[in-house]
Swiss-Prot record:
Residues 1248-1312 form the HMA domain. This is Putative late blight resistance protein homolog R1B-17. Belongs to the disease resistance NB-LRR family. Residues 521-823 form the NB-ARC domain. The lineage of its organism: Eukaryota, Viridiplantae, Streptophyta, Embryophyta, Tracheophyta. Confers resistance to late blight (Phytophthora infestans) races carrying the avirulence gene Avr1. Resistance proteins guard the plant against pathogens that contain an appropriate avirulence protein via an indirect interaction with this avirulence protein. That triggers a defense system including the hypersensitive response, which restricts the pathogen growth.
Amino acid sequence: MYFNNELSGLKDRFLKSLLAQKYPDRINFFLWELKFLDCFLHLQNFAFASECGMLDVSQKMLKNFKRMCATFRSIRPNAGSDNAFAYLKEVICKRLCATLLNTRPDACSDDGFAYWNEVIWKTKQEFRAKYSFPKTPLASNKVDDDDINIHSPKFVMEFIDAVVGNLNVLVKINDPCSLLFVPGPKEQIDQVSKELKLLRFFVCFVSNKCIEPQYGHTTFYIHALIEASHIAMVVWLHLPVYGNGNQDLAPSEVSRLLSDFISRNSNYIDVLKALKSTIPQAQNKHAAESGIVETPTHNLMVGLSDQMVNLQEMLCLLRDNLIHLPILDLEFHLQDMDSVILDAGLLIYSLYDIEGEKEDTVLDDMNRALGFDLPRNIEPIKVMVYLVMQKAFQCNLPRVHGLGYVDFLLKNLNDFQGRYSDSLAFLKNQLQVIQTEFESLQPFLKVVIEEPHNKLKTLNEDCATQIIRKAYEVEYVVDACINKVAPHWCLERWLLDIIEEITCIKAKIQEKNTVEDTMKTVITHTSSQLARTPRMNEEIVGFKDVIENLRNRLLNGTKGQDVISIHGMPGLGKTTLANRLYSDRSVVSHFDICAQCCVSQVYSYKELLLALLCDAVGDDSARRKHNENKLADKLRKTLLSRRYLILVDDVWDNSAWDDLRGCFPDANNRSRIILTTRHHEVAKYASVHSDPLHLRMFDEDESWKLLEKKVFGEKRCSSLLLKDVGLRIAKMCEQLPLSIVLVAGILSEMEKEVECWEQVANNLGTHIHNDSRAIVNQSYHVLPCHLKSCFLYFGAFLEDEVIDISRLIRLWISESFIKSSEGRRLEDIAEGYLENLIGRNLVMVTQRADSDGKVKACRLHDVLLDFCKERAAEENFLLWINRDQISTKAVYSHKQHAHLAFTEMDNLVEWSASCSLVGSVLFKNPDSYLYSPAFSISLILLNFKFLKVLDLERQVVIDFIPTELFYLRYLSASIEQNSIPSSISNLWNLETLILKGISAKTLLLPSTIWDMVKLRHLHIPKFSPENDEALLENSARLYDLETISTPYFSSVEHAELILRKTPNLRELICEVECLEYPPQYHVLNFPIRLEILKLYRSKAFKTIPFCISAPNLKYLKLSGFYLDSQYLSETADHLKHLEVLKLCDLEFGDHREWKVSNGMFPQLKILKLEYLSLMKWIVADDAFPNLEQLVLHGCQDLMEIPSCFMDILSLKYIEVDMSNKSVVKSAKNIEETQVEDNQNTNFKLVVIKKMMWKVDVGVNKGRLETFKRLAPLPGIKSVAFDFNKKKLTVTGDMDANEVQLVVSKLRKRGML
């Protein structure tokens, strides 16, 4: 309305005043009155307002305002203006609030509000007696064409909205002491409000149908305005006034209001009949407003309303699905849809014109009275309801699908029919037919994956997409049936149509002979698309001159700190080049400390500091509790007096550099910082001595070498003709490395034929103009359909985020992206998909496992990530909801099965009501802190009833587990409780459960967890299963469970029982209760398929109470135990296939000696020893025959590495860190023998300068400050204390003897 902004500002002024808390009810009452007055002032140009007295009311109240504000002489109407609106706004907003809340202008009273109350009351008494409903014929209420905006439908709807808003205030007030309280039932006011809303819908509907206003429509708008204004006046006059007694709204007035509405239904009917002759106008983005089909049943007779139940149900379904349905999806049905809606409106309003109805009115009598056949008229409505419901679901289905969705549906159909047999009984036959049809199509879907280069690839993928869409629809129909959100006739018809459509798809497949043979026999050969792409040496290609230039800057130049800034456009290889230098051995050996961080466009300052500190001094979980200032100070002190190399990657603006630069002190010791950025301004701003380096483009020779290496690996292109085409393609990439790599990914999947490469060259020729996105789009276009969804899913991750592969694969499986294949694990198939994307150069590997070369972590280039986000949004696949994005229900209310990524939980609350059919909710935030919303996040999540993936990354604390989401397959979050409810078993589809308790207490796992037979991955830090052995014995076995972390086993018997329940376990991380002195080692048989085992102690150093027996174990980590040679020898006898052994923080018995006999650990490839008390290590000549890597960290008591390592021909790498000089010397002797005598050119020795010594000094807390004096001494990096063990730990470059000398001096001085 005209006065809305002023009222809003006035309310803000009231709420900010000191009286807001004292008189909140007065403020609300005052604003309520002004809103009604505003309504009446807007009617001053209409004749009916003057005839019925509304205009007199507004003029009277305006005079009162003027008199109340008479003391403010400075307030005058603008010159030449007698506009009541302008004067009212000026007076009210500037002066009246002060008058009302403080003093009366013409009296000494201290209560201006009491005076205002009295004025209103007298005015209402004066006008109540003489007010009457306007009887003027509608025709006489015409206004001139010049005033068309005043009575436009927009004006009418805004007026109705204002009146409805004031009525809703009365309905909500239940406090008898409130000035706005209306005693007695509120049904009368509520019914008036509903009538007005219905009228408003009708006005909107008419306006949508008629772009050009006609005389009849304008008359109708005036009629609607008269009705609404009459309601406003009656309600205002009869409102109870504080201090004058509560007076209810007169029942007679309410009855008259409703009867007035009903008596004028003939006007609605006339307008609807006129609209039937018009052509539907599609001027709006969405289908027409359907509010007119909301049946106003309060005046329908009981007998009649009972007969209209079915009609009302259909109309509600029509309304609910039409409101936000994009009109483009119904463009061929607009005429039919308009006809149905108009007929429905005529049917409803005609019911009120039947006079003399009796309560025993029957359907036949009603049909005769109306002049038409009700059942026949309802049938078109049923057809339209079904069409609209179907379209509302189909129109925004994602256009990219996971081919594993049919597998998920087929499993669930069996479960649904077993769990909900009663609800699904009437659909049993149809569901059985559908199940059979989908099973018959499984071989075809397998062909689509295994033969992506089939000549009918496009047709195959189109058919596969249609099949998946039908699977989505079946799932929705089944759920709608179970939850009774749609009538049986509609769902039954829908399933019959799905069966018919599947039959058509099969016919199309057979007709084109795409699977003529495979529909009868199953293809058994392994696809090249599932095979792993051979890994090649990831050595950088090109930029040799640039590398040499930058290496010289890092090692030479000024003695002061210097920043080496590298800038250039996306895709040039700035990050690759910087990482190449950062990992260069000749560079790294020059610096004491090396650390790196990636900033990105959106970053967390705290996370950057933590990343740098982790590289500089090691990881420390307690450090996360510190604030940013403390972390920054810690980093600065760590780097002070040390020569450091820092890599700061992907800086977007100067402020990011300002945040970090203070942490890098300049000690004039040739410290260096490498900085990469896209922007020259940032590079120049950060520079100190060296000029920024603008990274050049590739030259033609470098372009071809990179393309050749990416396509052929270590081989060369032998065909001159092929090379000619390749050179042309490389040149077309315009010397941009990213473009070359992406095109190489396309070529590597093609036959090495000139014709194929020519086709790529021709396609690229029309797209490439310094536009990497065009090449990315080409790479995406040639992806097999089963890889497209996997690739676009990367758009759900943050910029520069390092993605854990285990987590990614679990998400892919939960999203049904992975198609099952008989005899193969889904995880193995998913790894093949990933390697395929890596082979196409769409995904960058950041970490591989040392033992088997499998990818452990990856990331996406910024250009590729942006493409994934944009393309995923276009395909209705993934939508990012950012902090400043406004919820638009009209656009996103039906994003069926899409994935939503949120950066703030508040966004989730705003969007939850309009995203009930979303399949995935992913929370992404660069900060790692726990987020505890003030609202019930779990209640919000219940709105997402089709949710299959809920990944809150254990960052968001949920108040309870939403166990009603039975489609859920992946759940990751933090919880407040110390126990998990037994209702967790209601999530019977759950495959991955990742929970973290916010307290340090052990989480209690209910026994019902053993009912979750689909569970594959269970990860809960420090949980304890209910120790009810009888209950566990009788529970089911979890045959699908493959990974568990981190249960607490209180006894060997407890562990045995759990292991029997998980026969197919592959990875186990657990804590065990240890024994002081076990009488003998009990052999604990772990599941035969177990490959990874990590054991941690639960308390202080004690012996493991069992000997490990796991015939196929490949990875073993033991941490925190008391061990001896006997235990390790007995364990080795049961671990013949062990490839990786990590012993961490162990105390050794037997005089701190470890003897390794011949034949022990025959398959071991990696041996890592960290912080052991080991002094003497004796290894037989034939032990560790296949060892490749030996890593020693913090083994400061070890005297030397056994000489037998010189003769292990498979040895490739030794790393020594924080150890004594004797260990370093023995490692160098081994290196010399391996390289010179054994000619092992692949051998590499890495000695890290940091050294650690532990000295027993009898430390007590009172001397803590004394020891801190050690830290600033030259050569000492840090000092740490362990009061329990009475040990001092000094980290630095000093010799151990020098440390002992310092300690001796401190003792002599009485400081120890």
